C-alpha cells in the first residue's frame, strides 16, 4: 500500500517475492516430528512428506496485492523453487493449489522473463549443492512452454548456472555446454563459485572432502582451472571457440 501511494510509482511491482519466492508459510505439518528430525534440509534430497507445500496462502497474497488501487501488475522476477511446483503430495487440495499457482505465476506474474536456478546440469554436482536433479528443470521448462503456448504468450525462461562448484570438473562443464546448446540457451546469468561461510559447499571446497561422507571432492581453485570451466558457458561466442575446442581435446571430448 505504501509503495502504491508513492507519487512516482507507475503501477508495476517488479519483484513480489525474494529468495525461495514460493515457500511462503511452508513448514512442518507435525512440528513434533520436526523437533526429532535430523535431516539438514526439508527439500533435499527429496521433499519431506511432513512439509506443508500448500501454495494457496501465497496465491491469496498475490490476489490481495493485485486488488489494491494503483497496482497494475505484480511480477515474480526470480527465486521460484520449481522442485516444489513439481512435487506431488498425498493431499489432493495441496496439489491443486500448486497447479493453480504454477499457471497463475506463468500467465500473470512474469514480466517476459522468469529467472530460475537449475545451477548445473550434472546430477553429481547438483547433489552436492542440495539442488534437485536436472531432469526437473526439463519438466518445469516443458510446463512453462506449454502454458505459454496455451495462453498465447511468448515468455522466456532464463536459467542461472554456476561454474567451479566443488565436485565440478571440466568434463561436467563440457556436458553443460552440450545440453544448454541443445536447449538453445545463450547463457547470461552465470557465476563462478564463491566460498561463503557456514555452507556444505564451502566446507568441501576448503577441506577437499565432503563433510558428511568424508569422500574426496575436487574443486577448481587456480585462475587457470576456473577460467577453463567458465568459458564453457559461452560456447556461442566466436572469441571463445578456439579455447573451448582446445580444452575439449585435452579432456578427450573430440565429439
Feature locations, PLM:
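Conserved SAM/AdoMet-binding glycine-rich loop
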Residues: 2-158, 163-166
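C-terminal, active-site-flanking charged/polar segments
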Residues: 2-10, 136-143, 177-212
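Alpha-helix initiation and N-capping motif
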Residues: 58, 62, 98-102, 187, ...
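Ankyrin-repeat helical core positions
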Residues: 66, 106, 181, 236-237, ...
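Catalytic cores of alpha/beta
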Residues: 165-182
Amino acid at each position: 500500500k505504501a509503495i502504491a501511494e508513492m507519487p512516482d510509482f507507475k503501477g508495476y511491482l517488479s519483484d513480489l517475492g525474494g529468495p525461495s519466492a514460493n515457500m511462503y508459510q511452508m513448514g512442518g505439518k507435525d512440528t513434533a516430528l520436526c523437533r526429532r528430525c535430523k535431516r539438514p534440509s526439508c527439500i533435499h534430497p527429496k521433499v519431506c512428506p511432513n512439509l506443508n507445500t500448500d501454495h494457496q496462502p501465497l496465491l491469496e497474497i498475490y490476489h490481495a496485492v493485485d486488488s489494491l488501487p494503483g497496482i497494475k501488475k505484480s511480477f515474480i522476477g526470480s527465486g521460484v523453487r520449481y522442485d516444489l511446483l513439481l512435487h506431488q503430495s498425498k493431499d489432493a487440495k495441496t496439489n491443486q493449489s500448486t497447479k493453480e499457482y504454477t499457471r497463475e505465476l506463468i500467465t500473470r506474474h512474469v514480466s517476459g522473463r522468469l529467472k530460475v536456478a537449475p545451477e548445473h546440469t550434472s546430477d553429481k554436482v547438483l547433489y552436492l549443492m542440495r539442488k534437485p536433479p536436472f531432469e526437473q528443470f526439463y519438466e518445469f521448462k516443458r510446463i512453462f512452454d506449454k502454458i505459454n503456448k496455451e495462453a498465447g504468450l511468448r515468455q522466456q525462461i532464463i536459467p542461472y548456472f554456476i561454474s567451479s562448484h566443488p565436485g565440478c570438473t571440466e568434463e561436467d562443464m563440457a556436458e553443460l555446454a552440450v545440453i544448454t546448446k541443445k536447449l538453445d540457451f545463450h547463457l547470461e546469468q552465470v557465476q563462478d563459485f564463491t566460498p561463503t561461510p557456514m555452507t556444505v559447499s564451502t566446507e568441501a571446497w576448503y577441506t577437499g572432502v565432503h563433510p558428511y561422507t568424508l569422500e574426496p571432492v575436487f574443486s577448481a581453485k587456480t585462475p587457470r582451472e576456473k577460467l577453463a570451466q567458465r568459458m564453457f558457458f559461452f560456447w556461442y561466442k566466436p572469441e571463445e571457440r578456439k579455447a573451448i575446442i582446445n580444452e575439449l581435446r585435452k579432456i578427450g571430448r573430440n565429439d
